[in-house]
Amino acid sequence: MNATTAPLPYSAARLHELAQLLIGNIRELAQAGWTPATSSNFSHRLDEQHAAITVSGRDKGRLVEEDIMVVDFDGQPVGRPLRPSAETLLHTQLYRRFPEIGCVLHTHSPVQTIASRLYAGSGVIRLEGYELLKAFEGNTTHETAVDVPVFANTQDMQVLAAQVEALLDKQSMWGYLIEGHGLYAWGRNMAEARRHLEAFEFLLHCELELLKLRSPR
């Protein structure tokens, strides 16, 4: 007699839908050169207790549906015994804290990585006066400033998650950098998260170009 298979605690149909959404968008980001050497990780809220997230160590430009797994908001695998990204807690803490957040994107473009190294000492990059600041949800004017935190890199995700949590208590954030690493950005859905990600990429690139122009020759 075969053992009865326990039902999944989430919708398989919804997971399939989100896997296709993630794979298509991640492939475009990989083609842009933002996910080198299997780096980066991506997730989407699945329901009130689970998220769909990329499996660790997979080439982000060649993902298939089996490369998208499910975790609970404690970062534990659900359904299949696969290994999620080492940084899963940085995703799930956002879903746990903000019910409105539906998607979290983490990339490693050269611009993001270089900016994170240059501004690590100050711990923040101030973006001010740019028209594209209106790309961030809730911003309606260029006459404002957005502070992008730069956290020190660490392999201890509990420590980093606690640092992020402490800053979330103090300020509005659409994303942050990790030193020598890359950028996290999020939104209510994939479209908004990508808009925030692309806005950060553009604005950080502008800041790096301004630094070069202002440097004495």
Curated annotation (Swiss-Prot):
Gene Ontology cellular component annotations, sorted alphabetically? cytoplasm
Concerning Gene3D superfamilies, the annotation shows: Class II aldolase/adducin N-terminal domain
Q: Does the keyword Nuclease apply?
A: no
GO process annotations (BP): L-methionine salvage from methylthioadenosine; monosaccharide metabolic process
Record-annotated residues binding Zn(2+)?
H106, H108
The entry's keywords: Amino-acid biosynthesis, Lyase, Metal-binding, Methionine biosynthesis, Zinc
User: So, what pathway does this thing act in?
Assistant: Amino-acid biosynthesis; L-methionine biosynthesis via salvage pathway; L-methionine from S-methyl-5-thio-alpha-D-ribose 1-phosphate: step 2/6
Cofactor binding remark: Binds 1 zinc ion per subunit.
Q: Which SUPFAM superfamilies does the protein's record reference?
A: AraD/HMP-PK domain-like (SSF53639)
How is this protein named in the record?
Methylthioribulose-1-phosphate dehydratase
Source organism of the structure:
Xanthomonas campestris pv. campestris (strain ATCC 33913 / DSM 3586 / NCPPB 528 / LMG 568 / P 25)
**Lineage, please?**
Bacteria, Pseudomonadati, Pseudomonadota, Gammaproteobacteria, Lysobacterales
